[in-house]
Curated annotation (Swiss-Prot):
Residue positions of motif Nuclear localization signal: 147-151
One Pfam family cited in the UniProt record for this chain: Homeodomain
Biased composition, class Basic residues, residue ranges: 147-156
Localization per Swiss-Prot or TrEMBL: Nucleus
Major subcellular location class: nucleus
GO cellular component: nucleus
Gene Ontology terms describing biological process: axial mesoderm development; forebrain development; negative regulation of axial mesodermal cell fate specification; negative regulation of DNA-templated transcription; paraxial mesoderm development; paraxial mesodermal cell fate specification; prechordal plate formation; regulation of DNA-templated transcription
Tissue: Highly expressed in the central and outer tiers of the inner nuclear layer of the retina.
Protein's recorded name: Visual system homeobox 1
InterPro entries in UniProt: CVC (IPR023339), HD (IPR001356), Homeobox_CS (IPR017970), Homeobox_domain (IPR051775), Homeodomain-like_sf (IPR009057)
Top-level taxonomy: Eukaryota, Metazoa, Chordata, Craniata, Vertebrata
Species annotation: Danio rerio (Zebrafish)
Subunit structure: Interacts with UBE2I.
Length: 344
């Protein structure tokens, strides 16, 4: 072999490395970008195939053309096994095709179609499973909503007769027993559980009403307004106006109640006292009597000191006389006792 043939042997080795690596013509600012995933795009044969076909150096025979595809030259004008078949198929491809499609190869076409059909079936299975799951969830939600709607009860509308009977029973006892509830159920023609719920709501309403005014009826009874009423002091106008306007639920019934309220009784007593002449006469008589009593007590208090001194002196003299009398009486008692001893 000559030196020229050795040089030709070395040329394909140098030119084959960039073809299987990164194609410099396809590099840009963003990096490596390929037009497709065909074999010609991966090997970089498409960009060099078109100028070779249109160039004047194309040989008359097909072997020379296939041997010089893409500017590559092989020893003896022959291609390796497999590469010649791919290059011949690439040479038969029309020049305007953007990429090498697998449909041009009859052996790969059946494989790609079968693979594509398998992917479609898998996607359909996935979508069908998702649809089933979503459908099951929707069915579960609908069933849960239907159960919630079934559990909801309708509000019981009480008649005036039923409310009257229930209020009477509540005034008698806030916590009726089973027997009382059954009797109410017979009178009102209501179920026993409905009556129990009504009493629970009525007790809550009663507690709320009791706590509205003064925070508690007991506290209000011993509070400021209760003391004012007990001492006949007029209440504020806001409290009285609230009772007159019909807001009896906002105040304690014992304070401003119409039948027997403390405020009403105290106001009646105050009105009667200044109007009757007997009361005025009795008041003046009591005042005069009190003045006389005070004068007599003052004078008696002044004379009381002298009387106490005289009484002290008299008491001392009487005590001395009593001591003397006891001393005089004691000797004969002793004699009598001695005589009794001798006789014994």
């Amino acid at each position: 072999m000559t030196g020229r043939e050795e040089a030709t042997d070395e040329k394909p080795k140098v030119k084959l490395y960039p073809s299987f690596g990164i194609d410099k013509s396809r590099l840009n600012g963003s990096g490596f970008r390929s037009k497709g995933f065909a074999i010609t795009d991966l090997l970089g044969l498409e960009s060099e195939l078109q100028p070779h076909q249109s160039g004047p150096g194309a040989g008359p025979n097909g072997e020379g053309q296939s041997a010089a595809v893409g500017g590559f030259s092989f020893p003896g004008g022959s291609l390796p096994l497999g590469l010649g078949f791919l290059c011949s198929l690439a040479a038969q491809q029309p020049p305007g095709a953007p990429c090498f499609l697998p449909s041009h190869i009859p052996l790969l076409q059946s494989r790609t179609e079968s693979h594509f059909m398998q992917n479609l079936e898998q996607q359909r299975d996935v979508y069908s499973d998702d649809d089933c799951l979503s459908g099951d969830r929707n069915d579960g939600k609908n069933s849960g909503n239907s159960q919630k709607r079934k559990k909801r009860r309708h509000r019981t509308v009480f008649t005036s007769h039923q409310l009257e009977e229930l209020e009477k029973a509540f005034n008698e006892a806030h916590y009726p027993d089973v027997y009382a509830r059954e009797m109410l159920a017979m009178k009102t023609e209501l179920p026993e559980d409905r009556i129990q719920v009504w009493f629970q709501n009525r007790r809550a309403k009663w507690r709320k009403r009791e706590k509205c005014w003064g925070r508690s009826s007991v506290m209000a009874e011993y509070g400021l307004y209760g003391a004012m009423v007990r001492h006949s002091i007029p209440l504020p106008e806001s409290i009285i106006n609230s009772a007159k306007s019909g807001m009896m639920g906002s105040c304690a019934p014992w304070l401003l109640g119409e039948p027997a309220g403390m405020h009403k009784k105290s106001m009646e007593i105050v009105k009667k006292a200044p109007g009757t002449p007997e009361s005025t006469h009795s008041d003046t008589y009591s005042e005069e009597h009190k003045g006389k009593d005070s004068d007599t007590t003052w004078s008696s208090g002044a004379n009381g000191a002298d009387d106490s001194e005289d009484m002290a002196i008299d008491l001392s003299s009487t005590s001395k006389q009593e001591n003397k009398s006891t001393l005089k009486r004691s000797p004969p008692r002793t004699e009598n006792s001695s005589d009794s001893e001798n006789e014994s």
